[in-house]
């Protein structure tokens, strides 16, 4: 138990659910997690197929701020991930091949719980990238086309954050991808060793 633990997220990005086993499984996982710790909300599937949850969480890595805003909420419609439930072989948590055509009405967001964008951004930046002679795209990874200058990075980040903040009447919160670089993923706001990667006062101002 620790105060920094805000919620439990048993599953991530389940986009290939079958219509028979997964709904029952996800419902059971929600119940079990809540019984193990009734003091914290359960985000049953982060960024994937939602059955029962205390937090409706979506992932969207659109890099253009205006398009990001439009995708998350437009004309009264919230963003929902596209589920692939008609594959011959579903690819979720270790289930055997099942009939993917069973009738199941997947829930749509109805406002009864918080709606969070708990993955977005992921903008790639390699420290001292502007000083490098080679294109680091081949050596590391991030979402979208990497910015070519630090100023371009700050502009894109601020645009994305402002796009979500402008939806404060619909979106309850956000989580940026990600806090630190991880192995080949060079999209953190800190380096892998937790050293500063940017002007952190400027980063703080953007996220504030």
Describe each model-derived feature in a short phrase.
Residues 1, 63-67, 197:
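Short, structured secondary-structure boundary patches
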Residues 1-56, 62, 112:
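Active-site neighborhood of glycoside hydrolase catalytic domains
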Residues 6-8, 31, 76-208:
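Substrate-binding clefts and catalytic carboxylate motifs of secreted carbohydrate-active enzymes
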Residues 14-18, 50-52, 64-65, 123-127, ...:
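Flexible loop/turn segments at secondary-structure boundaries
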Residues 20-22, 54-56, 68-71, 128-130, ...:
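Short aromatic-enriched loop/helix-cap "lid" or pocket-rim segments at secondary-structure transitions
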Residues 58-63, 74-75, 192-193:
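Short, hinge-like loop/turn segments at secondary-structure boundaries
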